[in-house]
Regions:
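Ligand/cofactor-recognition surfaces for anionic moieties
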Residues: 118-125, 129-131, 153-169, 200-222, ...
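Short terminal or interdomain "cap/linker" segment that borders an active site or interface and mediates
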Residues: 637-638
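Short glycine-enriched nucleophile-adjacent loop
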Residues: 641-645
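Regulatory modules associated with amino-acid/nitrogen control
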Residues: 1-251, 266-294, 329-333, 343-353, ...
Length: 984
């Protein structure tokens, strides 16, 4: 199109003048109607909250829409992107939630001002993003607001302390101080005092001057502001409450984070005030209290299925995840998360009675009797069996019913819970792929996560890990195998824990992106504590079908930080858990931090040294090459790099390291000093300084397809003497890809693997690689020292407070490290010795047989230990004191026997005796005995051991020519020979 320039730009054409006049008249006519209406109908707070310029911008947008005859649907964005204003026709139910839903997710919502016209024809919602402008002590207006508020509090809120109120106001923003009234700031402070440093929300309800409206204020710590505002608006909509005005404000709560205040001026849909005595308020209040901890799937579910209440929606979502874990081994595709959930949603006629069965059974006010529960279950079983249009639906509901029947405890009725948790009958999840029956299983479901805790003994311990998939596809994959991973890790831990009183356990939660780690860890732990704390108020809300007290001991694993550890211990104490100090190991101060002391790696190093010696390499005298997965910033891998240099110096040649960030490779060996720098700084291998490489070395980041391929294949590609998996996902080497570990000539790329990381190899892969000539030290042997260290820490935590522990910590830790190295040495020697005697049996199989032999023997010994304490006190005491680090025994004395739980002491003795005998006499020592004979033989063994010590001392003190030789033979074989004596 060609534009023709007018010869006289200052004189508009008659056509232009006519159009301008017409438009001006239309705008003027519209303005004459809209402006007075606007000034009369917008609430007073709108004009207080909104600058004159912003008011004019809003009016111009409204006029443009009105003049054109279109509905008002305008979104205004400030030039800097820090402010968005949504102007909409009509204050219909849910309009605020819909507007908030469409706000950008990548910006932090710092404030919101929601206003609707008095006649309900218009809403103007303004949202501010980015960091708040903090209080400025040089700003006179802000200082005046603080002083005015403090003066106001003296008259109207005399219970508020001026200094605390001032600190609160200083932690607010400039906008907060200059826009809120003294009354509102005082009311906020009253709420702030109640939740500061906590994770529980609080809700207040106040009357407004308008007799038809009320003010609902929600105060919540460390919440996502955008999410909180949207959820609150949706819950109000579900309960037929209309929002006429709303505000969102944030105040700092150092050192705990921040507190968000979401305030609504609202009324019921029938234009009546919301009153606390109104029966409609209690369910609304209850659901608001759940908002911070509620999964988004629940909010979406009740939005599309209004026939379900919020509590029912939560149960459907939770049981869908549990049912999926039950059915995944059958058909992972048919029983995906979405298909299980949609089946439950779409068949409410079956779902609702199952939910009613669950809630009735565990309602603490009137729990369903067992007979009635069984009768209803049978009726539902018949209904489910009659489903004829879908085999999958029948399977899903059958599993759903079995899951409900397997629940022994639940926190569903506990007030202020962070998550939904159940203690399950462990038989629920046992099957062909999970043959061993755990002792106990917990399932926890919450906002953005679900997780399990599995243990194989009454007293058990194991780490808590957080799995953080990067996207939805990876989340689905990790979620699908979650229980199998926890089950496998717990069973591996059971094998690993053969030297300590605790059995094997593991906990893991998988986060759905973009779920926040801290919140999910807190929700999971709180859900477990709900079910095990004896605190009376909590117990009164739990119907118990288990019938016994339970103790859980956790430790840190992937993505658990020192901050989490401190919070977990403090929260356990706040929840009145009796062994709070022992609830979590590796406490930064009152514990033994695994990474700081390298406890796991110390054991891995002992196994590596003895295995290298068995292959003709003395690492203290000869150069050897090693590749490692896991970065210098990791616990096991990083400490291995440090210890290899400490113990072997230049002999230890680390030719390759791979972690999540990339790879570092150098055939001359990666520079030890540079690796040490990365370890101390907590940096990944991608930060390795290329200047420290040889001419053939390289560092490649995993930010390209080539880098990812190099990272994922390093453990297969590099040819060296030993491979130490010190990090990486379970089943990295599996039955499908184990051949990639072999060289073209069929020989393994490293003839020795020492598994510092758990489950890096699958059982089938281990067997195949062993047959191909690889000597493999299995994870349950190689990295057992980490859990052993935690066990010693737990013992000290049950006997000492933090102050007492810190006084003995240096000596105590040194003695623990001695015990760890000795335990690793004993096992390495017997394993390799058994391997020489049974060359056709793969070493991983011997490792498992060793663990099973010790555990089975301990299981047979434990029931008899109670009588030992009474009738063989000297032996009982000797075994307990031999297990404990000397400094702990010296410090607490007889309190060891008075204060440690009886069951714990019995397992100290049972495991201590079993491991002592099997390490000395061999895997098959107890194999041919009846279980009833094991305890008797073990006791006689200990008695003969005491006798032999006396004989050895006697021989050593004699003047016999071969006294030393005789004493050595007695020590080596005297006990077993003495056992063959016939007692007379």
């Amino acid at each position: 199109m060609t534009t023709v320039r007018s010869n006289d730009a200052t004189q508009p054409s008659p056509q232009t003048e006519g159009l301008l006049d017409q438009l001006s008249a239309e705008f003027h006519a519209t303005a004459c109607v809209v402006v007075p209406w606007f000034l009369d109908n917008m609430p007073k707070m709108y004009f207080q909250d909104t600058s004159p310029e912003a008011q004019r911008v809003h009016l111009r947008s409204i006029l443009a829409a009105k003049t054109s005859g279109r509905p008002i649907d305008v979104t205004l964005k400030s030039p800097d992107g820090h402010s968005i204003t949504a102007i909409r026709s009509g204050n219909r139910a849910g309009v605020l939630a819909d507007i908030v839903r469409d706000l950008p997710m990548d910006s932090s919502l710092r404030a919101a001002k929601i206003h609707s016209s008095k006649d309900g024809e218009l809403v103007i919602d303004t949202f501010e993003f980015g960091e708040q402008e903090p209080y400025d002590k040089s700003n006179a207006a802000q200082n005046a607001a603080i002083e005015t508020t403090i003066e106001f509090s003296r008259t109207h809120h005399p219970s508020l302390q001026a200094d605390a109120l001032r600190k609160f106001l200083i932690g607010s923003s400039a906008r907060y101080l200059t826009t809120l009234t003294p009354l509102r700031m005082c009311r906020h402070f009253e709420l702030f005092r109640q939740i500061s440093g906590t994770d529980k929300p609080i809700v207040s309800l106040e009357s407004e001057d308008d007799p038809t409206t009320s003010r609902i204020t929600i105060a919540v710590s460390n919440a996502r502001t955008r999410t909180m505002l949207e959820r609150a608006a949706r819950i109000l909509m579900r309960h037929n409450a209309s929002i006429t005005r709303a505000h969102l404000d944030i105040v700092q709560d150092a050192p705990y984070g921040s507190v968000t205040f979401v305030g609504f001026i609202a009324q019921w849909a029938d234009h009546t005030r919301i009153d606390a005595k109104d029966p409609r308020w209690a369910p609304l209040h209850s659901e608001i209290m759940r908002l911070k901890w509620l999964d988004f799937r629940v909010v979406e579910l009740i939005g599309r299925r209004p026939e379900f209440t919020l509590p029912q929606g939560e149960l459907i979502s939770a049981f869908a995840d549990l049912v999926r874990q039950m059915l995944v081994p059958t058909d992972a595709l048919a029983f995906s998360r979405d298909r299980v959930t949609s089946t439950m949603e779409s068949r409410a006629a079956i779902t609702l009675p199952i939910l009613e069965l669950f809630t009735s059974r565990f309602d603490p006010t009137k729990p369903l009797a067992d007979a009635e529960f069984n009768a209803r279950s049978a009726t539902l079983r018949t209904t489910i069996d009659a489903i004829s249009d879908s085999d999958d639906a029948r399977e899903i509901f059958s599993a759903f019913l079995r899951a409900v029947q397997a629940v022994l405890r639940t926190n569903f009725f506990v007030a202020d819970r962070f998550s939904f948790s159940v203690r399950l009958d462990p038989a629920l999840l046992v099957g062909p792929t999970r043959p061993e029956l755990p002792f106990g299983v917990f399932f926890v479901y919450g906002r953005g996560f679900h997780g399990f805790h599995v243990r194989f003994k009454e007293i058990a311990r194991g780490g808590l890990r957080v799995v953080k998939p990067a996207n939805a596809v990876l989340f689905d994959r990790e979620s699908e195998r979650l229980f199998d991973e926890v089950y496998g890790l717990a069973f591996a831990q059971q094998l690993k824990n053969k030297d300590i009183p605790e059995g094997g356990a593991k906990a893991a939660i998988v986060l759905e992106p973009p779920a926040e780690t801290n919140r999910c860890v807190k929700a999971f732990v709180d859900g477990i504590l709900d079910l095990i704390t004896p605190e009376p108020v909590t117990r009164s809300r739990i119907v118990d079908h288990l019938g016994r007290e339970e103790f859980i001991f956790l430790g840190p694993d992937e993505n658990i930080t020192p901050m989490h550890i401190d919070w977990i211990v403090a929260h356990a104490a706040a929840r009145k858990y009796p062994l709070a100090n022992a609830f979590m190991s590796s406490k930064p101060n009152g514990g033994i931090n695994h990474k700081e002391y390298g406890v796991t790696s110390e054991g891995v190093n002992v196994f590596l040294r003895i295995a290298l010696l068995s292959q003709g390499i003395d690492p203290t005298k000869q150069r050897f090459t090693v590749k490692i997965t896991g970065g210098p910033d990791g616990d096991v891998a990083g400490n291995m790099m440090r210890i290899l240099h400490r113990d072997y110096g230049a002999n230890a040649c680390i030719v390759g390291v791979a972690d999540g960030s990339g790879v570092g490779e150098d055939p001359q060996g990666l520079d030890h000093a540079e690796l040490e720098r990365l370890f101390v700084a907590g940096l990944a291998i991608s930060h390795f300084n290329p200047k420290s490489l040889s001419a053939k070395g390289r560092v490649v980041k995993a930010d390209t397809p080539e880098g990812v391929q190099l990272r994922n294949s390093l453990h297969n590609r590099l040819v060296c003497d030993a491979f130490i998996p010190g990090g990486g996902r379970p089943a990295t080497i599996n039955e499908r890809n184990w051949r990639e570990y072999l060289q073209p000539n069929g020989k393994p790329s490293s003839p020795l693997i020492v598994e510092g990381a758990n489950l890096f190899l699958t059982p089938d892969a281990r067997i195949s690689l062993a047959k191909a000539g690889t000597l493999i030290i299995k994870d349950s042997s190689a990295n057992k020292c980490g859990v052993m260290c935690s066990s010693f820490e737990i013992a000290s935590s049950m006997l000492l407070n933090e102050e007492q522990f810190l006084k003995i910590k240096p000596t105590f830790v040194g003695q623990v490290l001695e015990k760890l190295r000795e335990a690793a040495r004993q096992e390495a020697i017997i394993l390799l010795g058994e391997g020489r005697r049974h060359p056709s049996v793969p070493l991983p199989e011997l490792s498992t047989k060793l663990s099973l032999a010790i555990n089975a023997s301990a299981n047979a010994i434990q029931p008899a230990v109670a009588s030992w304490a009474a009738n063989n006190r000297e032996i009982f005491r000797e075994v307990v004191l031999n297990h404990m680090p000397r400094e702990l025994s010296k410090t607490v004395g007889e309190r060891i026997f008075a204060e440690l739980p009886t069951a714990y002491l019995e397992w100290v003795v049972a495991k201590g005796v079993a491991s002592r005998i099997v390490y000395r006499e061999g895997i098959d020592f107890f194999a041919s005995m009846e279980p009833s004979a094991v305890a008797e033989t073990a006791l006689r063994y200990l008695q003969k051991e005491l006798e032999m010590r006396g004989l050895i001392q006697e021989v050593q003190g004699s003047k016999l020519q071969h006294a030393a030789r005789i004493a050595a033979l007695l020590e080596r074989a005297g006990i077993r020979a003495a056992l063959l004596e016939i007692e007379t």
